[in-house]
Design a protein with these regions (language model features):
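Sequence context of c-type cytochrome heme-c attachment sites
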Residues: 270
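N-terminal secretory signal peptides that target proteins for export/translocation
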Residues: 1-25
Length: 368
């Protein structure tokens, strides 16, 4: 199938140049037919019977796009829709979770999410390492992988929701489970963005959630208000959480209890902040600031969000998507070792780390 789609991708460029955008919808339908025929003709018995265990199945309602995003935004607007861009990669357990748990339709929540997404958005899938040519909103042409690099895509899946003018309404860096993705989608399609921030919208819903126990780990700073850094000191990990946050509790209960994680935590000062506490604090840069303003200035929207600062008080990395222990540990190691200075793409660092551990004979489970 990859060969088939590559063939179709090459053909479509000349086709569009000759016949124009009037053929777009017909060509999209033909793409699937041609790809299916070529796949059947070229498939060996093995490839015909055995699917790749690492492939991510994209739902059929995603658009087979020409990847000219200015045109895609305009076409979606004519249909009273907006564009949702998905960056993913094969072998990504979080991408699989998005496609199965969120968009798979196997549960009532998934069916509701899928119906709303189809109704309000034109969904377009991009490969983080792909070579298909894209034309971004500013007219810049680049293969998928270069566009991902330019947009600083650090996590898969990454979802970008564009408005009818092509502006980014929201960007989700990493996976969000259905119980969180559903309210985010409601905020996007329900007109709430015009009256309140996503952070405020989610906060009102979190009040109804069950309370979660506050962590008491020895790795946490006793004084979470003293965040100022000094040259040569430890880097800082600031954890923005709430007291009604199941993923926050899971992070402390699972990832932070791994034997390999505890030495890493010792290389950081780790502060846990919840909304409204502390009321005043000293920022990593040494400024006295209001606690709520500190979170707002950092554009904290989701809980948990972990923001890393170097010894100069500068933000160097963050994650706010749902992550299992392997990826949490990788993020802390990425900062603790200074690898972010040498390798700006976190996904490449993850690949190298996983390979290094495998060569050392250590089992790797990306979902554990």
């Amino acid at each position: 199938m990859p060969c088939s789609l590559a063939f179709v991708s090459r053909c479509r460029r000349g086709f569009v140049g000759v016949f124009g955008v009037a053929w777009r919808l017909a060509w999209r339908a033909a793409t699937f037919a041609v790809a299916a025929v070529i796949a059947l003709v070229t498939a060996t018995p093995a490839t015909a019977q055995v699917a790749s265990p690492h492939a991510i199945d994209i739902p059929r309602w995603f658009t087979e796009s020409f990847l000219d995003f200015k045109d895609e935004v305009a076409e979606a607007a004519r249909a009273n829709k907006r564009v949702m861009i998905y960056f993913g990669q094969d072998g990504c357990p979080y991408c699989k979770a998005l496609m199965v748990a969120n968009f798979g339709g196997g549960t009532p929540a998934s069916r509701e999410i899928t119906a709303k997404t189809q109704k309000h958005f034109v969904a377009i899938a991009l490969n983080l390492w792909g070579d298909r040519e894209t034309t971004w909103l500013d007219g810049t042409r680049a293969p998928e992988k270069e566009l991902a690099r330019r947009l600083a895509v650090q996590f898969t899946p990454t979802l970008m929701f564009l408005d009818t003018d092509g502006r980014v309404m929201l960007r989700l860096n990493g996976y969000q489970p259905p119980e969180r993705f559903g309210p985010i989608l409601d905020w996007l399609v329900g007109g709430h963005a015009r009256s309140e921030s996503l952070a405020d919208y989610l906060a009102t819903r979190d009040v109804k959630a069950a309370p979660t126990p506050a962590p008491k780990g020895a790795y946490l700073m006793r004084n979470a208000a003293a965040l100022a850094r000094k040259p040569g000191g430890k880097p800082l990990a600031v954890m923005f959480e709430s007291d009604r946050c199941a993923p926050c509790a899971e992070l402390h209960r699972e990832a932070f209890q791994r034997p390999t994680m505890k030495p890493l935590l010792g290389r950081f000062d780790v502060a846990r902040l919840v909304p409204g506490q502390p009321a005043r604090l000293t920022s990593p840069a040494g400024a006295a600031v209001d606690g709520k303003a500190f979170a707002r200035d950092l554009q904290i929207t989701l809980h948990p969000t972990v923001v890393f600062f170097d010894d100069g008080g500068r933000e160097v990395f963050r994650f706010d998507g749902y992550m299992r222990p392997f990826h949490v540990e990788s993020a802390f190691e990425y900062v603790a070792t200074g690898a972010y200075r040498r390798e700006p793409q976190f996904q490449r660092y993850l690949q190298a780390r996983a390979e290094r551990l495998r060569e050392a004979g250590k089992p790797i489970d990306l979902w554990r």
